Design a protein with these regions (language model features):
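N-terminal targeting/docking segments
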Residues: 1, 17-20
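Low-complexity, acidic/polar, glycine-enriched regions of mature
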Residues: 20-193
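Bacterial N-terminal signal peptides
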Residues: 8-18
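Bacterial N-terminal signal peptides that target proteins for export
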Residues: 1-8
Length: 193
């Protein structure tokens, strides 16, 4: 009997250690302070800039090892805003994003790596019904600080460049008219749940 109690006690202690170290925190984007900005070359002359302002999803951080964290972000494609309503309507149409058929884009991480300047987050971006691997260069997390909602908030900035034609977006337009490279800048203010 003493042996069983001792074995049970040792098993409890040996399992409690790793479980305590593997605590995670769940963070969600603050929609008022998070966005995905994009820029693309127009007629090889100037950049057209815009943003998606309705960002959702979760970031689950491993408190002991950030490289074991996961990212699952959803972008409402219908929230596209370039400051020109006619262009925004065209971007939502089948000519570009086809938001009626593909109203959301998602990014799901596959790995997180520490770098000298922050993090590299690898994952799969699904946009316009096409999924491609994407690598984000991430600065952060910053904070946490207490937000107006009395929850801890942290910040992340991420950048990447994608090919619009790889995602089947506006494939009929040559690169001389609309650049193929689209620069993305992601600003996330996330609140701990």
């Amino acid at each position: 009997m003493k042996r069983l109690v001792l074995l049970t006690g040792l098993l409890s202690v040996s399992l409690a250690g790793p479980l305590a170290l593997a605590q995670t925190s769940t963070w969600v984007p603050d929609k008022a302070h998070s966005e995905v900005d994009f820029s693309v070359l127009h007629l090889s002359l100037s950049n057209v800039r815009g943003r998606f302002g309705n960002i959702g999803g979760t970031i689950t951080t491993n408190d002991a090892d950030i490289t074991k964290s996961t990212v699952n972000i959803t972008i409402d494609v219908t929230s596209v805003d370039t400051g020109v309503s006619g262009r925004d309507g065209d971007l939502k149409s089948a000519n570009f994003f086809d938001a009626a058929q593909f109203p959301t884009a998602t990014f799901v991480s596959t790995s997180v790596e520490k770098t000298a300047n922050g993090l590299t987050v690898n994952g799969n971006l699904t946009l316009h019904g096409v999924t491609k691997p994407v690598t984000l260069a991430v600065q952060g997390p910053t904070g946490p600080v207490q937000g107006m909602d009395h929850k801890p908030h942290a910040g992340f900035e991420a950048t990447t460049t994608i090919s619009r034609t790889a995602f089947g977006i506006a494939s009929k337009y040559p690169a001389a008219m609309i650049g193929d490279d689209v620069k993305l800048e992601i600003e996330l203010d996330v609140a701990k749940q």
